Amino acid sequence: MDFSIKGCDWSKGTANGFLTGKSDCIVLGVFEAQTLSGAALDIDEATKGLVSRVIKAGDIDGKLGKTLFLHEVSGIGASRVLLVGLGRQDAFSQKAYGDAAKVAWRALLGTKVVQVTFTLAQLPVPERASDWGVRAAILALRNETYKFTQMKSKPDAGAPALKRVVFSVDPADDKAAKVAAKQAVALANGMDLTRDLGNLPGNVCTPTYLANTAKKIAKDWGLKVDVLGLKQIQALKMGSFLSVAKGSVEPPQFIVLQYRGAAAKAAPVVLVGKGITFDSGGISLKPGEGMDEMKYDMCGAGSVLGTMRAVAEMGLKVNVVAIVPTCENMPAGNANKPGDIVTSMKGLTIEVLNTDAEGRLILCDALTYAERFKPAAVIDVATLTGACIIALGHHNTGLFSKDDALAGELLDASREAGDPAWRLPLDDEYQDQLKSNFADLANIGGRPAGSVTAACFLSRFAENYPWAHLDIAGTAWKSGAAKGATGRPVPLLAQFLIDRAGA
């Protein structure tokens, strides 16, 4: 799909190109109380009051989410007009804009429209310019067009008719909007990769499959990749990671993918993604109901790989390293048992009180490995705890960090990207719950504050650099009728790196 940007100041008579230019449809916004947006006023004048007459007749009331097509419109180059309800003008918000864009795309995708002129990006969204509107609209469109049909014998209907979108933006935002469009496409491509990896079944998306995906990203975008196999992992003495992997016939992989966009001496940001490609719980077996969704336990890895693809396509001037420890967590005669004690790469011994708290066991060795890159910051991403879902539900990703500056950057990025996160505590007092009579620490701390104690566990292996942990258990995928991976938190991570790169 092709996206282009054209500057237009509707209030100053510079809209002739939009009024006369050939297009299958032009999208206009209508507020409640029959108030037209700037673009709609110009179109109304060019069509001799058609838009006003339709509104006056009550065919559309401007309520948010309502749409109306006008066909065979004369006086303009577009053959039809799509009116989109925006709600109350004094309550118009970023969310309202996103909802309006979403319903507009849904309406258009149900037609044979090939080329559309989209004017909503110029709507007066508080604290936002039209370049933000372009990015949000492209992401909304790509979200609407995403389908996962790879595993069906007869894939669903093909690509939508819509092929080209022309965005009208404020002339002062023209350059920024072009950058925003490029970034939005790259971000959507990264999110689609993340969703595809998450939606694939565990018998397809194995640790080896993830490793091959990383190799393909490296080949396509000129990145450096190293994939460590069993013997190399053993040589590094990653006993914690290996204790989880040993119960599966699928060989573990330790993926290191490097993007160099800045000076060689510039310290990289390291992203660590949990890559449990299927989590049965091990000997501490999960209930059968809903276990199919444990294919999503690699969404941390998927989001890190998706972010790397997006960053490479954007060409950001920043160095980024992705580390993905990946394996399955399965019950077997040689699998971890409750009460087993394993030795991590750092040398700390861990009492495995619950084999279903395995994500932290593979991440801790990856966090130790990350030290060799002398990182500017390390962010691990994991579907780590059900407790985070109880605490935050499915809207906010859980954010943990003792570094206020890093936490602030991530929260700012989450707001800018529309990929919300919420900071949770990481007080030292919670560490007491991880005490063990027989090892340096236990892998669980009981039911109270389960997401916090999981983060506390990881913090013991991330003491030598600025570190943050993102618990995406509630945000990486959806259940029910809309079941599927969401692609989060790729927008948050990408925005964080955009900000770091100063792009």
From Swiss-Prot:
Active site: 286, 360
Cofactor: Mn(2+)
Reaction(s) catalysed (UniProt annotation): Release of an N-terminal amino acid, Xaa-|-Yaa-, in which Xaa is preferably Leu, but may be other amino acids including Pro although not Arg or Lys, and Yaa may be Pro. Amino acid amides and methyl esters are also readily hydrolyzed, but rates on arylamides are exceedingly low; Release of an N-terminal amino acid, preferentially leucine, but not glutamic or aspartic acids
Xref: PROSITE patterns: CYTOSOL_AP
Binding-site positions, Mn(2+) 2: 274, 279, 297, 358
Enzyme class: hydrolase
Manganese is among the record's keywords: yes
Subcellular location: Cytoplasm
GO CC terms in record: cytoplasm
GO biological process: proteolysis
Pfam families for this protein: Peptidase_M17 (PF00883), Peptidase_M17_N (PF02789)
Sorted UniProt keywords: Aminopeptidase, Cytoplasm, Hydrolase, Manganese, Metal-binding, Protease
Cofactor binding notes: Binds 2 manganese ions per subunit.
Coiled coil region boundaries: none
Coarse class of the protein's main subcellular location: cytoplasm
Gene Ontology molecular function terms on file: manganese ion binding; metalloaminopeptidase activity
Physiological role: Presumably involved in the processing and regular turnover of intracellular proteins. Catalyzes the removal of unsubstituted N-terminal amino acids from various peptides.
Listed HAMAP family: Cytosol_peptidase_M17
Protein family: Belongs to the peptidase M17 family.
Protein's name according to its UniProt entry: Probable cytosol aminopeptidase
Gene: pepA
